Amino acid sequence: QMQVFQMITKSQRIFSHAQVSKASSQLPAPEGKPAALRPLQGPWPQQLPPLAPAVDSLNAGPGNPEAEGSPARRRKTTPGVAREASPGNTRRDAKGGLKVAAVPTPLAAPSLDPSRNPDISSLAKQLRSSKGTLDLGDIFPSTGQRQTQLGGEELPGASLPGKQAPAENGAVSGTTKGEKGPPCSRGGGYRLLGNPRAPRFSGFRKEKAKMDMCCAASPSQVAMASFSSAGPPADPSKSKLTIFSRIQGGNIYRLPHPVKEENVAGGGNQQNGGSTDWTEPRSTFICKNCSQMFYTEKGLSSHMCFHSDQWPSPRGKQEPQVFGTEFCKPLRQVLRPEGDRHSPPGAKKPLDSTAAAPLVVPHSIPVVPVTRHVGSMAMEQEKDGEERDSKESSQQRKRKKRPPPKRLFIPPPPSTAGEPGPAGCHQSRLRSPMFLVDRLLKGLFQCSPYTPPPMLSPIREGSGVYFNTLCSTSTQASPDQLISSMLDQVDGSFGICVVKDDTKISIEPHINIGSRFQAEIPELQERSLAGIDEHVASLVWKPWGDMMINPETQDRVTELCNVACSSVMPGGGTNLELALHCLHEAQGNVQVALETLLLRGPHKPPTHLLADYRYTGSDVWTPIEKRLFKKAFYAHKKDFYLIHKTIQTKTVAQCVEYYYIWKKMIKFDCGRAPGLEKRVKREPEEVERTEEKVPCSPRERPSHHPIPELKIKTKSYRRESILSSSPNAGPKRTPEPSGSVESQGIFPCRECERVFDKIKSRNAHMKRHRLQDHVEPIVRVKWPVKPFQLKEEELGADIGPLQW
């Protein structure tokens, strides 16, 4: 023990006993209740006074002219070296205060009278009046008995919750609610807390003292100096950080008066005379709403997030500043300044009105000594904080946070009156002109009719349901406002406004009144006069004679309709409507109607109502037009406008009609030429070779038009079924058993009757016919094709549309 005090005396040579006496004389105990401090037990009670100057010596110098015992001097006092909290001894009393229980030790010594050691009690008062905590474990040994409980009233500055400064080794142990904390990594020492409920001195442990003035201040000292609240009392109107502000991470701590605190921190560093090489210069960020300081952009952004959401205080009052980590138990109470009515009943009001709420400093906070001027510090931080955001954020954050998606904005429906009408009706957004130009000559301006949505305005200029709208890019206008761009000028003398489709016209909903919006109702007449009136419509079909009752007449009419639908008739059998009209003009005579269809055609006088009526398939296509149509179809597929531009003699409607008529007869396949064209263009030697392999005796007939039953065939079309169902349908050969043909090594194709020597060749050839699944061609020319080798134009002309 003597060696320890020799080392203390050697390191504290510059301190005098006069300063100790002066400091102790200015800290009297409160009247009425003596603050009895049971001294530390040990064999060296008379050598404790040199410790008191160590507290004030940290800020001693020409920069602090105040008296050493004054409240201003105590506010600027820098705490000593930080230490860990004691494991297992910190517990919470019934009212939320912290208690430090005394731990009995086997070492016992006679207790000393407190009156014989006035310096120790004054030292305890001075330590408790400081804002930070002082670690005395580096000075006193831990062999003595642990301290006992202090009595009396709380001292000035001690009524606020104490702040636990972090240990230098980064290991801080605490307790959570109702649980004991983990064991301390450094062992025996205990924390001295400025708690108003049960303040106690902690035990001390023996360690190497580092109190020399030439040494650099520890990070804990600078941290407490920079975070000490040396300004006026905290303003209750200013919002403090809540526990909600801590859940996003980052170092978020409130500085009520950052200008004065940073000035004090800078002064303390200069007075200490130590180097600050242990810190790295980093940027600080200040909240523009509540003037709180942050050391990371992440902390500021999370703080601003809760500013925007307006988190309410749980009990409508200021929240205590607590740790967001697992090492410290959050305090339950917040002591208000004097005069606060909302203070908890169990909390004592502080005697010193200038004391501010203490701060909680975690062990991982990066402390930056700031040496800016007092007047320009806040303004410079607001300007420089935004400029350094992009640079510092890329270095401090390891990974970038994915930006959140933009919120969906649904613009409200517009309303001229400020609120929607009944049943949620709103004004129409469809463009309508203000005035009708054709009504201006009457001398009165007539408003345009109201067109409720989704109806389209009948007097619109454009051709679309919705007019073109552009969102405003200015910051003042809301996104749902439309840009009213007048493409034409307004004549102010007459009030005529010719607007375009992208003009927003404000028309209030109203009932359209006038003869233009009302139906013309004729006068009421007798029902007997209705039979005399002639029908306005033209009669184009009427069942004549006994057609409705005679079955034979009905059968003849049915046969006429079947012939009109076959390829016997000009137009490809698409003139069923024409046949019925001819039968009506013949007054039910089927023979006269058939002659009209085949020979004369429907000749109508110019005064007839159907004189200009166009029947389907009545257009005449020349061979050149058919060739151009096929070439254009292979090039442009079903783009009939380009096909019309290629032909130039037929309209788009005529091209579409021609395509769908011939689609039932000849397949237009872009992948390959139609089967009919290939059969026509076969080489003569191939035909002769086929005839030698498959002997046949074709039966010829003058006409090669198939009957109506062969109009449309599916893929399951078989040659044998055609030959059996229609023996006179067209050129064909006698069917032979398939086994006899295949037994001779000949494999014909059942679709196009091409003959192959190998079955694999025929199977590969059959893949070409799989593309044609929808319809089979009507015209199927059978082998041999020698008598029917016609040109493409002649073949198309024979099966073409009507020829009158």
Swiss-Prot record:
The keyword Repressor applies. Coiled coil: none annotated. Residues 380-395, 690-721 have a biased composition (Basic and acidic residues). It is found in: Nucleus. Residues 509-601 form the ELM2 domain. A zinc finger (C2H2-type) spans 285-307, 747-769. Residues 396-405 have a biased composition (Basic residues). The keyword Repeat applies. Residues 21-120, 133-197, 379-426, 680-743 are annotated as: Disordered. Its main location: nucleus. SUPFAM superfamilies: Homeodomain-like. Residues 616-667 form the SANT domain. One of its GO terms (biological process) is regulation of transcription by RNA polymerase II. It holds the Pfam family ELM2. Keywords: Activator, Developmental protein, Differentiation, Meiosis, Metal-binding, Nucleus, Repeat, Repressor, Spermatogenesis, Transcription, Transcription regulation, Zinc, Zinc-finger. GO terms for molecular function: transcription corepressor activity; zinc ion binding. Interacts with DNTTIP1. Identified in a complex with KCDT19, HDAC1 and HSPA2s. Component of a histone deacetylase complex containing DNTTIP1, ZNF541, HDAC1 and HDAC2. Identified in a complex with HDAC1, HDAC2, DNTTIP1 and KCTD19. This is Zinc finger protein 541. It comes from Macaca fascicularis. The gene is ZNF541.
